[in-house]
Amino acid sequence: VTKTSITTPRRPRIGLSTYRDHVSWGPWAHEAAALPTTYVDCVAASGGLPLLLPPSGDAVLGRQAYAGQEASLAAEAVALLDGLVLTGGADVDPALYDEPADAETGGPQPLRDKWELALLAAALDRDIPVLAVCRGAQLMNVAYGGSLIQHLPARQGAEDHRGGSGVYRKMPVTLDPAALPGTVLGPSSTVSCYHHQAIARLGKGLTVTGRAQDGTIEALVDEGRAFAVGVQWHPERDHELRLFTAFVQAAGHVGEVGEADRNEKATARPSEKVIAHP
């Protein structure tokens, strides 16, 4: 008989940051790791394998279970990934960019901030693709040394980038067609926004590649990397698969390199998975 190895292409492994929230179902009420399923669906529909990355802590004892270990835990998690999505959510703590909190700024969530900053640092260290959405884009800017406008509606000439409580606002954005995400979406796009904060001082090493009509920064990239993109809008809300697909494809290249390295190390061993042909 002739034995032929089975090779099954694997989906790029995409980590999605999540948050902790109080949820209830049936008779139960618990703090849970939460994330809108639209993120998961968009990653899966774009060919990726979504993996959730919740911040770890102990709500009952009121302390963080892994205090001081965020960097090492994030490095372990990111070592398993081909790409990272920093998802939307609550305001970033202004203390991270050395400013006092505005009256309109939401309460700090140090557990999530520390965890996602550690995930981002580990992803950049491994140079895997990063897609940062809304809060994620703001956190990315802060990680690069930038700051935020804490309440955009208070700025003269600025539009409200929300459509009302729990309602996304459709807004046109102008994009640089020669840079991400414009190379994927074109020179302009109508997007779904829901943010009251925005990027103020741009982080070192980042480039603005998209703006709203009022001048608000809506897209930024680290041009020194193959794919490190932040968008202020919510592509998952519209199931905007073009951006997710470009991201997952970039992550696929990381997976292919890793798979090739593993295969090279295993060339001396016969495959354990075989098909026998007469």
Task: Place the predicted regions along the sequence by residue.
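N-terminal beta1-alpha1 cap of cysteine-dependent amidohydrolase-like domains
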Residues: 1-129, 142-144, 149, 153-182, ...
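Active-site-proximal beta-strand elements of phosphoester/diester hydrolases
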Residues: 228-233
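Hydrophobic, aromatic-enriched interface-forming segments
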Residues: 137-139
